[in-house]
Amino acid sequence: MLRRFLPALVVLMVAAAGCGGGSKSNGEAAKTADQVVTDAKAAATSAKAVHVSGSITDAGQPLTLDITIVKDAGGQGTMSESGLKFEIIRVGSKAYIKGSDAFLRKFAGAAGAQLLKGKWLQGSATTGDLAALAPLTDIGKLFNGALGSHGKLENKGETTFKGQKVVAIEDTTQGGTLYVASTGTPYPVAIVGGKDQGTITFDKWNDTMSITAPKGAVDMSKLGSN
């Protein structure tokens, strides 16, 4: 499921790809669509922290996420697919996951679910089953990957998203709209629509946040070794 979730999120972000502080216009509304996306990516990848949340639909299945990311530290939050919920944490090169009872029963069976109930599993964030978490918990990887390629873009001008002034950038090839703050720093604010219908929002840019590794995690490499 982790391997399916990331591509679905990236597709939505690429098809469309927080809040920018301040009230003075930053000039993004007058720029080309490609320049707005370039500026948004630069702003996002330079940020110290961000909160990413929302839901999309992949192959008819609802996917949701709520993740806090801290630059050069890691990230933590929750994700779910079709009611199967799990918590994730990445601290440096280590990743952790704790699944709901339903999640564990599906992927570990009844006996495994009973054994792992309420426990965190630990693995590598660079190789293995949990490697897919890395791009979702790394500001640079998330926004460079998501905003690094896209279809033909069109600047639809200034509008508002939930009361915030933004520039709407539409991907006329793949569908979807990226909203970028048109005042203050041009941070990505939200992604709406696209191939995978849904909305992803970005907020709490540069807020003070901390990521802590869970205690007593079970090393995944040792499961089933006996």
Describe the role of every protein-language-model region.
Residues 5-13:
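Sec-dependent signal peptide hydrophobic core
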Residues 15-18:
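C-terminal motif of bacterial Sec signal peptides marking the signal peptidase cleavage site
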Residues 2-6, 20-226:
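Subset-of-secretome marker
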